[in-house]
Regions:
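Transmembrane alpha-helices and adjacent helix-loop boundaries
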Residues: 1-293
């Protein structure tokens, strides 16, 4: 039994890493840039299908090389679509941007659903497994690199420019910050990492279908970000881990599972909100002290 449980929870490591990458990358756009995007699952699906098709059709290459090419291509193509979306929605904000990105995700899903070479509604199967529960080291390393890169970006000069656009885009533009450049860059980076996460996901499960990447998946990723805290990378990581593992822990609870799940979500929201208020009060205190000085 202990062996079975060990295997069961080991199998969650790759999904946890994938969800962390999705949450952290979406936080770049939604939390730090301040733009509500509901099409993250669309970028994930582009990466997943691109890498899966390349892996299936390059089986004659060494497995490691085939996997590397597939993952890189999935990441790049998703980033290209991120650029196209970023340029297209430069003048949109708030609800309008959310609607357009949501429509993008659904259009991608519908296109994949009707193409023959993607397997249509049946999806793709027999995808080579390069990142199963016994071989999660590569996925974990990629996840760490993703977190480090985005964290360094946020703490850099470019990251401060992105946050200034969120706070006040008019003021940011007035001091010479190129808003269009940073908005598009944020979309490209977030989409690229989402495509990378999708590639790793495809090579972990071995079977992908269009309905996996519907708007529910985009909402799920957004929940990771909101519950963890907008503009809070450690919070996104913790939220992604808890919400990925929690359903497995509650699997044996039967009727109480949804109730317990809801209680945990509420507690996370309360904790996050109280932490936000505490930070806000500290900021006000420091501002008052600064004025007195």
């Amino acid at each position: 039994n202990s062996g079975i449980l060990s295997r069961q929870y080991k199998s969650l490591i790759v999904p946890i890493c994938v969800n962390i990458m999705l949450a952290v990358s979406l936080n770049l756009v939604t939390g730090f840039l301040g733009e509500l995007s509901l099409g993250h699952a669309g970028f994930m699906s582009i990466g997943a299908y691109t890498s899966a098709l390349i892996s299936i059709n390059t089986s004659f290459l060494p497995p490691a090389l085939s996997f590397f090419i597939a993952v890189v291509c999935g990441c790049i193509l998703a980033a290209v679509f991120g650029f196209l979306i970023g340029v297209s929605v430069l003048r949109l904000r708030g609800d309008y941007l959310a609607i357009v990105t949501l429509a993008f995700g659904e259009i991608i899903k519908s296109v994949i659903n009707y193409l023959n070479f993607t397997g249509g509604s049946k999806g793709l199967s027999k995808i080579p497994l390069y990142s199963d529960y016994n071989n999660f080291t590569v996925v974990f390393i990629i996840m760490v690199i993703c977190i480090v890169l985005i964290s360094n970006l946020i703490n850099s000069r470019d990251g401060r420019a992105i946050k200034s656009i969120r706070d006040n885009d008019i003021a940011a533009e007035s001091i010479g910050i190129k808003i269009s450049k940073y908005k598009v860059s944020a979309f490209v980076i977030a989409a690229g990492f989402a495509g990378l996460a999708g590639s790793l996901y495809a090579h972990n499960v071995g079977i992908i279908k269009p309905n996996i990447f519907d708007y529910n998946k985009s909402i799920e990723i957004l929940v990771f970000v909101v519950l963890g805290g907008m503009g809070n990378i450690p919070g996104s990581i913790i939220s992604a881990i808890i919400l990925t593992v929690l359903p497995e822990f509650l699997r044996g609870a039967d009727n109480l599972r949804m109730l317990l799940y809801a209680i945990v979500l509420i507690l996370m929201m309360i904790f996050n909100n109280s932490k936000f208020k505490a930070n806000l009060s500290l900021n006000k205190t420091f501002r008052k002290l600064g004025k007195e000085d």
